[in-house]
Amino acid sequence: QQTEKPDIIIAATHMGHYDNGEHGSNAPGDVEMARALPAGSLAMIVGGHSQDPVCMAAENKKQVDYVPGTPCKPDQQNGIWIVQAHEWGKYVGRADFEFRNGEMKMVNYQLIPVNLKKKVTWEDGKSERVLYTPEIAENQQMISLLSPFQNKGKAQLEVKIGETNGRLEGDRDKVRFVQTNMGRLILAAQMDRTGADFAVMSGGGIRD
């Protein structure tokens, strides 16, 4: 910041958003970071990890029943906007800013649903899944660009490297808290491959 003199700074994080910074057993998240920084020092924090559509119902309180396609007000802490587009590509987050006289102002924010559907039941009793918002068509140019990489990865994943008759435990509630046979197998493979004396991995970095 001192050498480059950027007009804006946007932080991309994976720390989680917790109402009013009440992170419980989790590590401190985006709210705590924004409060710890100089006021307005970031234009925006684009977060992840807690897998929330960060749309505020009131100050320091997220909307827990957000409906796709409806207005979404992002959080703001210490003059810093905090946004998060839920999980798994369900939304594209869009923030429009105006930059005038050295000042940034957010003029619009929305979560754009990516072909999300809801279940509706008609008068005849039949049920159907329908789109919340108009369908977003696939971009054929992008598919052509990315398909070779996807196919290459798929071919590598289909190579058989071993087999087991037992279950490799990868349940989130297990791998986050205790050692599992899957974790030990992965670490043993890493040690064998590299000739290391020991191996360490994050609890739950690889899971079901």
Regions found by a protein language model. Name each.
Residues T3-I9, G40-A43, N78-I80, G195-F198:
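Loop/turn elements at helix/coil->beta-strand transitions in domains of secreted/extracellular proteins
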Residues Q1-G21:
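Short acidic, glycine-rich surface-loop motifs adjacent to enzyme active sites
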Residues L111-V114, E163-R172, S202-D208:
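A glycine-rich phosphate-binding loop feature that marks nucleotide/adenosyl-phosphate handling sites
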Residues A155-Q179:
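Glycine-rich phosphate/diphosphate-binding loops and the adjacent beta-loop-alpha structural elements
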Residues T180-I186, G205:
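Active-site catalytic microenvironments in core metabolic enzymes, especially phosphate/sugar-handling
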Residues T13-G16, G48-S50, H86-E87, G203-G205:
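Active-site metal-binding loops of divalent metal-dependent hydrolases
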Residues S25-E158:
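Active-site-adjacent helix-turn-beta-strand microarchitecture at beta-sheet edges
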